[in-house]
Design a protein with these regions (language model features):
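Extended non-catalytic scaffold regions that mediate assembly and binding
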Residues: 1-2, 25-33, 137-141, 170, ...
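Alpha-helix boundary/N-cap detector
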Residues: 2-9, 141-152, 156, 176-183
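Intrinsically disordered, low-complexity regulatory segments
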Residues: 4-53
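Residue-level detector of alpha-helical secondary structure
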Residues: 8, 12-15, 95, 158, ...
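Long, charged N-terminal interaction/targeting segments
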Residues: 33-171
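Extended, acidic-biased charged interface segments
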Residues: 146, 153-163, 184-200
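Cysteine-cluster motifs in flexible loop/terminal segments that predominantly coordinate metals
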Residues: 188-231
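Long, charge-rich boundary regions
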Residues: 233-235
Length: 235
């Protein structure tokens, strides 16, 4: 079932031509759980601070790749000196495909997405506003002195994703390059949210006239949504 493949391809297209580094997955950096509070007086800078772009998104694909990977477009944490625009993109490759039933599919996708709320690297405080669609990060001065990089942050996230046995591999993409087209990226992220909403809609809503449905456009454009929608209708 093809759902987010076009979104993933668009993310790659936006990165084409820009310098992208592959980082090692580092293990051993502590996770502070719910105690990861960084005051403004303790932070070195904020990724996505001062109304700069601050984006986060997760897309799921069925068996698209088998190796974990951390990619970085822009300066790494020790190289940053002030607030910069920021994006965190996760592409999760699941083994054995995705469920083909609305309820199970939606819950599987949300379970993968919710990992971002439960990873708290010491000195790296993620601030998520679902209403505003923002995901910014406060980075502490002390953590930078201890050597915090995106390798440690990404390593913790990858480890957390793999607590879900359905996950085959994870590609994490961090973007801090001010030259990156964040506006275009935000449009793709909005489209990915519409896809997820359409899955939920197909699961929960009574079948109505497709011509008056607010999600008709995304349903028409995404093959997997059409399959899901008409599969529900036939049950």
């Amino acid at each position: 079932m093809r759902l987010y493949e076009e979104i993933i391809a668009q993310w790659q297209s936006l990165l084409d031509g820009l310098p992208v580094r592959s980082l090692p997955l580092s293990d051993g950096w502590p996770d502070t759980g719910s105690r990861n509070m960084i005051l403004r007086s303790d932070m070195a800078y904020e990724l996505g601070g001062e109304n700069l772009p601050a984006l986060g998104a997760t897309a799921v694909t069925a068996g698209g790749f088998a190796q974990d990977e951390i990619l970085l477009c822009g300066p790494d944490l020790p190289e940053i000196r002030k607030d910069v625009p920021y994006a965190r993109l996760t592409v999760a490759s699941v083994r054995d495909g995705l469920p083909d039933q609305g309820s199970a599919l939606y819950q599987a996708i949300k379970k993968i997405d919710f990992v971002r709320y439960h990873v708290n690297p010491e000195g790296f405080m993620t601030r998520i506003s679902a209403i505003q669609g923002r995901e910014s990060v406060r980075v502490s001065q002390d953590a930078l002195k201890k050597g915090l990089t995106f390798s440690q942050v990404g390593g913790l996230m990858v480890k957390s994703y793999h607590e879900n046995p359905q996950i085959q591999a994870v590609r994490l993409i961090y973007i801090t390059d001010s030259a990156f087209p964040f506006g275009a990226l935000e449009e793709t992220i909005q489209k990915s949210r519409e896809i997820t909403r359409a899955i939920d809609h197909a699961m929960t809503a009574a079948m109505t006239d497709c011509n008056v449905c607010s999600l008709k456009k995304v349903c028409d454009e995404v093959e997997g949504i059409r399959q899901l929608h008409f599969g529900q209708e036939q049950q």
